[in-house]
């Protein structure tokens, strides 16, 4: 009997494959058997396909779209992107399209604003598509990837000198509620560009920004939109907005649609694209909601066990590819729940990405902007993007020495709280002086202050001159001879 069932199934699948759906249209179903959170369960479905898109028509005539998540015999579990409120089990009509989720892409998307599903919300016409691309992207052959080597100058000293970002890198901003991560991201977008070396002509690069917001409030969306408009870059920006009052489930596809648009602009239009994704914590919580609705075995803190893999499908879509002029640099922003860096979201993100920029609440409380704590921050690709002919030959040594002095200064500050200032040595007092001036003069800067890498390095040298030359053990004698004397050589 089982063999007959298998043969019937194979025959049925063959007939479904060779069927001409242009003249013999798809079946529509009114077999909704249950609704659970963002999921709809359908019975008696013939030949459903994994990840197939389903068009859902409600009794009032409004349409929604969903995606097949799971198939069991003749049952299909469909995830509805616009939410399941108002779905009537008897009168809701579902049509299986036989295709995966594709998004229309075009160079005309720049300067436009879309919702989380990729539909225009700026009162403009629909995008005249040059292509329809799978939102999950195409896998990139690791052999074809180009190692990121060109440094992006952000104009922020704490990033440029201590945690340099390379073009094609993925580096998140680890922040928390109430911290100015949006302002930092906006400043990076506003000021970002290649390092302009004295012997290199000024390069006008093909620059574009793709901004995707997931679960943000109206104030955050308005802040970014207004900032892009005020600095004149709106015609180079493509915005995807899923607001806090939009369907939670839509957040699953928003970053994928944004990255599909970014890949088209980078690899087909030869643009250097900066992708800003905020807030990845909202995305992970949407993932947890779907997982809970499917009654999957939960992992840490209720998040699904496959969250690492799922986040990787987003973050790994950054980089450069051989034979293509464009690049994708990713700056995801995530808010750490309860300022906890060991929470699964920042923890797994840190494994996948090439470093992180850590926004610190204590620095913010002391009115230091940008409140970037350089000690837990890291850029894993920094070493290949700095040095002679890329920034300046003393860059790496100055960065190492600043790190060492700041770390020792923090230790001395902790010791001072225990033993008092009178018990400190003269060297300890120098480190304390450096600590205060480093945070005040180096880390702290204005919202619209755009420092070149050379200005930032010179500020670093001014701070290092607090110490006698023999205490600067991480800088070679050649660099000390050139830059340590006051008014040292400037490029």
UniProtKB/Swiss-Prot annotation:
Superkingdom assignment: Eukaryota
UniProt keyword annotation of Repeat present: no
Pfam families tied to this protein: ATP-synt_ab, ATP-synt_ab_N, ATP-synt_VA_C
Entries under CDD domains matching the protein: ATP-synt_V_A-type_beta_C, ATP-synt_V_A-type_beta_N, V_A-ATPase_B
GO aspect biological process, one term: regulation of syncytium formation by plasma membrane fusion
GO molecular-function terms, A-Z: ATP binding; proton-transporting ATPase activity, rotational mechanism
Residues binding ATP, per UniProt: 380
Gene3D superfamilies noted in UniProt: 3.40.50.12240
InterPro entries hit by this protein: ATP-synt_VA_C, ATPase_a/bsu_AS, ATPase_F1/V1/A1_a/bsu_N, ATPase_F1/V1/A1_a/bsu_nucl-bd, ATPase_V1-cplx_bsu, P-loop_NTPase, V-ATPase_su_B/beta
GO cellular component, as recorded: proton-transporting V-type ATPase, V1 domain
This protein's UniProt keywords: ATP-binding, Hydrogen ion transport, Ion transport, Nucleotide-binding, Transport
Family as reported in the entry's similarity comment: Belongs to the ATPase alpha/beta chains family.
NCBIfam families (alphabetical): PRK04196.1, V-ATPase_V1_B
Function summary: Non-catalytic subunit of the V1 complex of vacuolar(H+)-ATPase (V-ATPase), a multisubunit enzyme composed of a peripheral complex (V1) that hydrolyzes ATP and a membrane integral complex (V0) that translocates protons. V-ATPase is responsible for acidifying and maintaining the pH of intracellular compartments and in some cell types, is targeted to the plasma membrane, where it is responsible for acidifying the extracellular environment. Essential for the proper assembly and activity of V-ATPase. Required maternally for early embryogenesis and zygotically during morphogenesis.
PANTHER family: V-TYPE PROTON ATPASE SUBUNIT B (PTHR43389:SF4)
Subunit structure and binding partners: V-ATPase is a heteromultimeric enzyme made up of two complexes: the ATP-hydrolytic V1 complex and the proton translocation V0 complex. The V1 complex consists of three catalytic AB heterodimers that form a heterohexamer, three peripheral stalks each consisting of EG heterodimers, one central rotor including subunits D and F, and the regulatory subunits C and H. The proton translocation complex V0 consists of the proton transport subunit a, a ring of proteolipid subunits c9c'', rotary subunit d, subunits e and f, and the accessory subunits vah-19/Ac45 and vah-20/PRR.
Protein's recorded name: Probable V-type proton ATPase subunit B 1
Organism of provenance: Caenorhabditis briggsae
């Amino acid at each position: 009997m089982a063999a007959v069932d298998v043969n019937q199934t194979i025959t049925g699948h063959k007939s479904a494959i060779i069927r001409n759906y242009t003249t013999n249209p798809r079946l529509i179903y009114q077999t909704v058997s249950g609704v659970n959170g963002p999921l709809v369960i359908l019975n008696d479905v013939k030949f459903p396909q994994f990840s197939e898109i389903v068009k859902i028509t409600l009794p009032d005539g409004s349409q929604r779209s969903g995606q097949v998540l799971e198939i069991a015999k003749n049952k299909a579990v469909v995830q509805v992107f616009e939410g399941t409120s108002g779905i009537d089990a008897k009168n809701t009509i579902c049509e299986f399209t036989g295709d995966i989720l594709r998004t229309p892409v075009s160079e005309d998307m720049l300067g436009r604003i879309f919702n989380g599903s990729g539909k225009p919300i700026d009162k403009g016409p629909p995008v005249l598509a040059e292509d329809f691309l799978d939102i999950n992207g195409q896998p990139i052959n690791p052999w074809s990837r180009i190692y990121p080597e060109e440094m992006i100058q952000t104009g922020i000293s704490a990033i440029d000198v201590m945690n340099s970002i390379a073009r094609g890198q993925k580096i998140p901003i680890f922040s928390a509620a109430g911290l100015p991560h949006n302002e930092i991201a906006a400043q990076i977008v506003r000021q970002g560009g290649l390092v302009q070396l004295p012997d290199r002509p000024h390069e006008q690069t093909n620059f574009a920004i793709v901004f995707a917001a997931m679960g943000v409030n109206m104030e955050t969306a308005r802040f970014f939109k207004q900032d892009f408009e005020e600095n004149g870059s709106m015609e180079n920006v493509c915005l995807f907005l899923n607001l806090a009052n939009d369907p939670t489930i839509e957040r699953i596809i928003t970053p994928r649609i944004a990255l599909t648009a970014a890949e088209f602009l980078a690899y087909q239009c030869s643009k250097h694209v900066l992708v800003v994704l905020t807030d990845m914590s909202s995305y992970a919580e949407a993932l947890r909601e779907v997982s809970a609705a499917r009654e999957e075995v939960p992992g840490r803190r209720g998040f699904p066990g496959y969250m690492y893999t799922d986040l990787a499908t987003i973050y790994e879509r950054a980089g450069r590819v051989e034979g293509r002029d464009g690049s994708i640099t990713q700056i995801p922003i995530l808010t750490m729940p309860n300022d906890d860096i060991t929470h699964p979201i920042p923890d797994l993100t840190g494994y996948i990405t090439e470093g992180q920029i850590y926004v610190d609440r204590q620095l913010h409380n002391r009115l230091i902007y940008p409140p970037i704590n350089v000690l837990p921050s890291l850029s894993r690709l920094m070493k290949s993007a700095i040095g002679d002919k890329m920034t300046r030959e003393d860059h790496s040594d100055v960065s190492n020495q600043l790190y060492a002095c700041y770390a020792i200064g923090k230790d001395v500050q902790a010791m001072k709280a225990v033993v008092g200032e009178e018990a400190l040595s003269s060297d300890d007092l120098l480190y304390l002086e450096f600590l205060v001036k480093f945070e005040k003069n180096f880390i702290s800067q204005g919202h619209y202050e755009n420092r070149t890498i050379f200005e930032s390095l010179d500020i670093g040298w001014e701070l290092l001159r607090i110490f006698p030359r023999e205490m600067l053990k991480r800088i070679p004698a050649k660099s000390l001879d050139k830059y340590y004397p006051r008014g040292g050589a400037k490029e």
